[in-house]
Structures are given as structure tokens and as C-alpha cells.
From Swiss-Prot:
PANTHER family: CELL DIVISION PROTEIN ZAPD. Belongs to the ZapD family. NCBIfam families: PRK05287.1-4. It comes from Cupriavidus taiwanensis (strain DSM 17343 / BCRC 17206 / CCUG 44338 / CIP 107171 / LMG 19424 / R1). This is Cell division protein ZapD. Interacts with FtsZ.
Length: 252
């Protein structure tokens, strides 16, 4: 199955972007080539930009605390797997503790690093990190892969709590959803929300339907899913076929 997700609000949109960036950072950090570590470092800069919202840490703590309070009464329910419940609550409490220990804005230690700041300011310029622009960075790229990886891990360490909080919140949100099989008649599907509010829409497509690309949108009254295909130049074109898919709407 191929999963497409659509956030209903800016907060979830930010968390999805952070999740994508953290995954990219982890992948390229696990490689050994200097160019791959360059991508890892520029991805770290992107994470700082996205996470720079002053209230992001507060939002995560509040949401985790709300989830902990919602789950705590279930400890009195004999039909609930208490070991699994304790594991989830323990993970939430660990996430809250780590976020509370984070001082200042996300990535503040990186922005205070003059050498990293110089690289960051040049990285936004096309071709701006050549050896004649940043000879010290060029020299760093010729260090052993293990040394470069250790440096990036050290620089990324202040963001570990942010990643953990993001991961927990998104996992809990994705698990709190209702799903059903629907059909996009003539390539289009719409559904009234009947006053209910959601935070995330998921569209699951069978692998055999890879050629069909869902374009999703929503407001507080209705959601739409419209499928397109790409022509030889990869430009989108409308679809007239009936397309089955699994729709899941998630909300805490």
C-alpha cells in the first residue's frame, strides 16, 4: 500500500515536515561519502528553520500531557492490556521530561556556533559551499567519515527531544483514526465532515494504482480527493476512472 497524508492544520503540517527531515537526516548520516554528509548537514539546517517556532516545544509538551491525562484513567479498565498501556504512558512521560530539559529555542546551540552559521549562510546560495568559499568546510569534508558523523551527531543532539516528541505525537494521532474503503467515482471523491474536526487525512492506495496521484484538500465542512495522472512530460492530467482507496481520518 502507498500512503499519502494531508494535514488539516499548521501544527500537524509542521510536525510532518519535521518527521520527513529527521528521516532524511538519519538516512544520509548513515552513509559514508562526504557529499552525503553535506546533505545531512544542510538537512540539519532545515530542521532548525522549521523548528524555530518559539511555541513548538510548548505545543508538544501540552499535547503529550493531554494524551497522558486521557490514557491514565484506562489503568482501571481490566479489558485494557496494562503492560502496553504502561509502555505508552512511560514513553509519553519520557518525551515530556526530555522536552522540559531542553533550554531555549530548538537548535539554539547550533545558531550560536559561528562556524556552522557561516556554512548555513552559504548553503542557501546555489553552489555557495565550494572550497574557495568555505575552505575550512572543504577540509572538514576530507576528514574520515567516522569523524564527520560524530560531529553531526553532536550538533544534532539538542534536537533529540524534539524528534522524540514529534514521533510520539504523530504516532498517537495516526492510531486514533477511523478508516473505510471508498471509491473516487470518475477520479473524484468528496465527503461532508458533518461538524466533526480532524487533524490528519490518510489515503491508502494499492501498489497496482501507483499511476494515480491523489490531490487532497479540506475545510471544516468537507474534504476532497481528486486523482490525476502524469503525461509523458510528467504534467498532471485528470482521471475519469473509478479508483478504490482506503480513507482514514485521524483526530485525538
Amino acid at each position: 500500500m502507498i500512503l499519502y497524508e494531508y494535514p488539516f492544520n499548521e501544527r500537524i503540517r509542521t510536525l510532518l515536515r519535521l518527521e520527513d527531515l529527521f528521516d532524511r537526516l538519519e538516512y544520509f548520516l548513515g552513509q559514508d561519502h562526504a557529499q552525503q554528509h553535506h546533505v545531512a548537514l544542510t538537512t540539519l539546517f532545515e530542521i532548525i528553520d522549521v523548528a524555530g517556532r518559539a511555541d513548538l516545544k510548548t505545543d508538544l509538551i501540552k499535547e503529550l500531557e493531554r494524551q497522558r491525562q486521557a490514557l491514565a484513567p484506562l489503568r482501571a479498565n481490566p479489558q485494557i492490556d496494562q503492560d502496553a498501556l504502561d509502555s505508552v504512558i512511560g514513553e509519553i512521560e519520557q518525551g515530556i521530561a526530555m522536552l522540559n530539559q531542553t533550554v531555549g529555542k530548538a537548535g539554539q546551540l547550533l545558531t550560536d556556533n559561528e562556524w556552522l552559521t557561516s556554512i548555513r549562510s552559504r548553503a542557501i546560495i546555489p553552489g555557495g559551499t565550494c572550497e574557495f568559499d568555505l575552505p575550512a568546510y572543504y577540509a572538514w569534508q576530507h576528514r574520515p567519515a567516522e569523524d564527520r558523523r560524530a560531529d553531526i551527531l553532536k550538533w544534532a543532539r539538542p534536537l533529540v527531544s524534539l524528534r522524540m516528541g514529534t514521533t510520539i505525537v504523530l504516532r498517537l494521532l495516526r492510531e486514533a483514526g477511523q478508516s473505510g474503503k471508498v471509491i473516487a467515482t470518475g477520479g473524484s471523491y468528496q465527503q461532508m465532515l458533518s461538524g466533526r474536526s480532524y487533524q490528519l487525512m490518510q489515503v491508502y492506495l494499492d501498489d497496482s494504482l501507483l499511476a494515480f496521484i491523489p490531490e487532497m484538500s479540506a475545510n471544516k465542512y468537507m474534504l476532497w480527493v481528486r486523482f490525476t495522472q502524469q503525461d509523458g512530460d510528467l504534467r498532471p492530467r485528470s482521471v475519469d476512472a473509478d479508483i478504490p482507496f482506503l480513507l482514514k481520518l485521524c483526530n485525538f
